[in-house]
Regions:
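Extended, highly charged accessory segments
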Residues: 1-23, 27-33, 39-267
Length: 267
């Protein structure tokens, strides 16, 4: 990353996968408590040219991600769903970004991007939701079911990073549809994958912590003081819908066993 505010000076190095989401053109990047805006990204040269700015918002990249399961190492049933882990191929493209205001998390703008698609082989933990599992939530529309699963992904990422004691950016989250001749209807997979080529050994331990992950997400969401979702639990309500938080809790209640008492959580 090169600061062009006064002179062309290298001020930081960022891993390439992270640079695509954090150093795209017009991104706001925080370095040593100072804000920088990316003026230009040299994709081939692996350089980002930034200028010092002061603004009241940050940027959040919008990506389109597909995950294909290459090999399942292990799996087990989970209250009508299935938990598993294995090797996957992740295809990801950054297609835009949002401007989010500090403190209020208000979306104050957006922009389009067209970065090349990236392919990565890594390892992933996932939950598979058969059509029969989702159909039991008769009070939810198909869109609300999708929003609920997206909200779960946000909560799972937070809890997983605490359980694994890693940076949340070390984990990628993607909601994809499982397609095969055996599958009939919409049967999504919610992936939490290692955000590094080849994986860094997070998926197998997370698979072993499935019960803690589910219980932790349920406690996190239910104990959050927000009304309809926030970045601290299921994500902003504008992204998961007005019922996204409650719908996510309904799914977690089934996964954990409805009526089980909530246990205190340290986060």
């Amino acid at each position: 990353m090169i600061d062009i505010t006064t002179d062309d000076r290298v001020i930081a190095e960022v891993a390439f996968p992270a640079a695509l989401t954090e150093l795209h053109e017009k991104a706001i990047y925080l370095h040593e408590a100072k804000q920088f805006q990316v003026e230009r990204m040299d994709y081939d040269g692996r350089k980002a040219y930034v200028r010092r700015v002061e603004c009241d918002y940050y940027t959040d990249a919008i990506d389109y991600t597909q995950v294909k399961i290459l090999e399942q190492f292990d799996g087990r049933p989970l209250a009508g769903a299935e938990a598993a882990h294995g090797e996957v191929r992740v295809n990801r493209q950054i297609v835009g970004f949002k401007k989010v205001k500090f403190y209020t998390n208000e979306n104050i703008g957006a922009g389009m991007l067209s970065l090349p698609e990236q392919e990565m082989h890594t390892t992933s933990y996932w939950l598979h939701f058969p059509a029969e599992f989702l159909e039991q939530f008769t009070g939810l529309t198909p869109t609300e079911r999708l929003n609920a699963l997206a909200g779960l992904g946000s909560a799972f990422r937070t809890v997983a990073s605490l359980l694994l004691m890693c940076d949340p950016r070390d984990l990628g989250v993607a909601l994809t549809e499982q397609i095969s001749v055996e599958v009939r209807g919409f049967e999504p997979n919610l992936h939490i994958y290692d955000n590094f080529p080849g994986g860094i050994g997070q998926s197998a331990p997370l698979y072993g912590l499935t019960a803690e992950l589910i219980a932790g997400a349920r406690a996190l969401i239910s104990q959050c003081a927000c009304e309809s979702g926030c970045p601290g639990c299921t994500g902003p309500a504008g992204e998961t819908g007005e019922r996204g938080k409650q719908s996510a809790l309904e799914i977690l209640n089934v996964l954990t066993g409805a009526g089980e008492p909530l246990q205190p959580t340290p986060f």
